[in-house]
Curated annotation (Swiss-Prot), chain A:
The proteasome is a multicatalytic proteinase complex which is characterized by its ability to cleave peptides with Arg, Phe, Tyr, Leu, and Glu adjacent to the leaving group at neutral or slightly basic pH. The proteasome has an ATP-dependent proteolytic activity. It is found in: Cytoplasm; Nucleus. It comes from the Eukaryota. This is Proteasome subunit alpha type-1. It comes from Oryza sativa subsp. japonica. GO terms for cellular component: cytoplasm; nucleus; proteasome core complex, alpha-subunit complex. Keywords: Cytoplasm, Nucleus, Proteasome. The gene is PAF1. InterPro entries: Ntn_hydrolases_N, Proteasome_alpha, Proteasome_alpha-type, Proteasome_alpha1, Proteasome_asu_N, Proteasome_sua/b. The keyword Electron transport does not apply. Signal peptide: none annotated. The lineage of its organism: Eukaryota, Viridiplantae, Streptophyta, Embryophyta, Tracheophyta. Residues 239-270 are annotated as: Disordered.
Length: 270, 262
């Protein structure tokens, strides 16, 4: 009668050792439009593909400033994402009030993950249906974390989440080794290229993406988390397209990789 | 500075048998609890200043029970974490409580095991919040605290020296003196302090201040402790005494030239 007897509440295990509700929440992340994040030693960049729900509506915001030194990009249920970014903001502001110093990014990601974890262990709760890329700056440099509804979190050099993010990941995997020494400008370009991979033929313009950056200049001064101006994004996109056309457009290779579903991934695998 | 100077409200005139509850000064915190509203065992001045390699801090090792010099060998300067020193004037048990708070903080940093640690600026800010919060509960921690330290920041090594007192007043300075030192040592520090002092010069200056305090502050004793904090960490030196000279004319005949009845 029931297709699955083990997915009616979050805390019930399947005999195979899986928590279906948690996995469903992780599926929700894949439904949202894509986000990418990447970092050098000194800067971290977040970018998101914006998709309007209908022709008549505007898109939802997917990139949020948390504090001067940190921000998030989210994929999945944006409503859940807003709740979590408000939580992050209050954690940061409380830490700043008490210690007069920014909350280290690793601690920020940890608190977020702990909050998500609680939802996987309480029968009266549901997991958050949102994945967050947390980018920020602290004493040890720039950082990028991915926070999953399961309560797992990982640090990355570069990562992508959301629908068709596999294409962006493939792009990033080819190039991440040089990212540590990238300039902010180079990071932004790669972020845009990665986002473009997820659009599947749709044209990348400044109106269907958001880019934000945080980092530290060589002299130690902080460049606070900031959305990059629409005009500047368009300029960068234009310059990228110009550069692409110059060396005889190298056919849109066979990069039409679909998402890697189908494979029997281990339950907690991202 | 450290405790109320109105003679008719002198804490030492209050009964010590716990009958504060009937007095207007006591604050009851629900039934059955009664908090200390006055200092009992107090330490005197702390002197601290930045020098070339870090921050130096000094005090005597005395603690008074009222005006009785009751304890002669207490450490009023302690290391906090890896980057800071804290020195305290005022109520000694309140200082011990503050040390417990700070231990808790550094221990939890250690347990997170993520490489993050509190620098002197963070410790100072934290203590500012604690002190002001307790003052607002009318249950102050009866201290003047000095926080000094060095920590590597994005712009290189950064020296830090700040203080906070029992009512939450707080500031940063190149040289700080609490208690009687605020009156007696600050003028000396203002004229003689330099940014690029060597440790030896700093010790000389600090000793000059301590000696003046020894001559003029009745609650100071001739047993001093010096501590320094640099990038290498904190060093608290064993106590020692200074050579005194009581043959000054003003000491021989203090009443001479003094206008007044004494």
């Amino acid at each position: 009668m029931f297709r699955n007897q083990y997915d009616t509440d979050v805390t019930t295990w399947s005999p195979a050792g899986r928590l279906f509700q948690v996995e469903y929440a992780m599926e929700a992340v894949k439904q949202g439009s894509a986000c990418v994040g990447l970092r050098s030693r000194t800067h971290a960049v977040l970018a998101a593909a914006n998709k309007a729900a209908s022709e008549l509506s505007s898109h939802q915001r997917k990139v949020f400033r948390v504090a001067d030194h940190a921000g998030v990009a989210l994929a999945g249920l944006t409503a859940d994402g807003r709740v979590l970014s408000r939580f992050l903001r209050s954690e940061c502001i409380n830490h700043a009030f008490v210690y007069d110093a920014p909350l280290p990014v690793s601690r920020l990601a940890l608190r977020l993950a702990d909050k998500a974890q609680v939802c996987t262990q309480r029968s009266w709760k549901r997991p958050y249906g949102v994945g967050l890329l947390v980018a920020g700056l602290d004493e040890s440099g720039a950082h990028l974390y991915y926070n999953c509804p399961s309560g797992n979190y990982f640090e990355y050099q570069a990562f992508a989440i959301g629908s068709r993010s596999q294409a962006a990941k493939t792009f990033l995997e080819r190039r991440f080794e040089g990212y540590n020494d990238y300039t902010p400008e180079q990071l932004i370009k790669d972020a845009l290229s990665a986002i473009k991979e997820t659009l599947q033929g749709e044209k990348l313009t400044s109106s269907n993406c958001t880019v934000a950056i945080v980092g530290r200049k060589d002299d130690g001064t902080v460049e606070p988390f900031e959305m990059i101006d629409v005009k500047r994004i368009q300029e960068i996109i234009d310059s990228m397209e110009a550069a692409e056309e110059a060396p005889a457009a190298e056919a849109e290779s066979s990069s039409m990789q679909e998402e890697d579903k189908g494979t029997d991934a281990a339950p907690m695998d991202i | 500075m450290r405790f109320g100077s109105d003679s008719d409200q002198d804490p030492w005139q209050q009964p010590m048998d716990g009958s504060h509850a009937s007095g207007s000064k006591a604050v009851a915190d629900g039934p059955g609890t009664q908090r200390t509203q006055y200092p009992y065992v107090t330490g005197s001045s702390i002197i601290a200043l930045k020098y070339k390699d870090g921050v130096i801090m000094a005090s005597d090792t005395g603690a008074s029970y009222g005006s009785t010099l009751r304890y002669k060998s207490v450490e009023r300067i302690k290391a906090v974490g890896k980057h800071s020193l804290i020195g305290a004037s005022g109520e000694f048990s309140d200082f011990q409580e503050i040390l417990r708070y700070l231990d808790e903080l550094t221990l939890s940093d250690h347990m997170w095991d993520d490489g993050n640690s509190l620098g002197p600026k963070e410790v100072h800010s934290y203590l500012t919040r604690v002190m002001y919060n307790r003052r607002n509960k009318f249950d102050p921690l009866w201290n003047s605290l000095v926080i000094g330290g060095v920590k590597k920041g994005p712009k290189g090594e950064e020296k830090y020296l700040g203080m906070v007192n029992m009512i939450g007043t707080h500031f940063e300075e190149n040289h700080i003196a609490t208690g009687f030192g605020n009156h007696m040592a600050i003028p000396i520090l203002r004229t003689e302090w330099r940014e690029d002092m060597t440790f030896e010069e700093a010790v000389k200056l600090v000793e000059k201040c301590l000696l003046v305090l020894l001559y003029r502050d009745r609650s100071s004793i001739n047993k001093f402790q010096i501590a320094k904090i640099t990038t290498e960490g904190a060093t608290i030196y064993p106590p020692y005494s200074l050579k005194t000279y009581w043959g000054f004319a003003a000491f021989e005949n203090p009443a001479q030239g003094a206008v007044g009845s004494w």
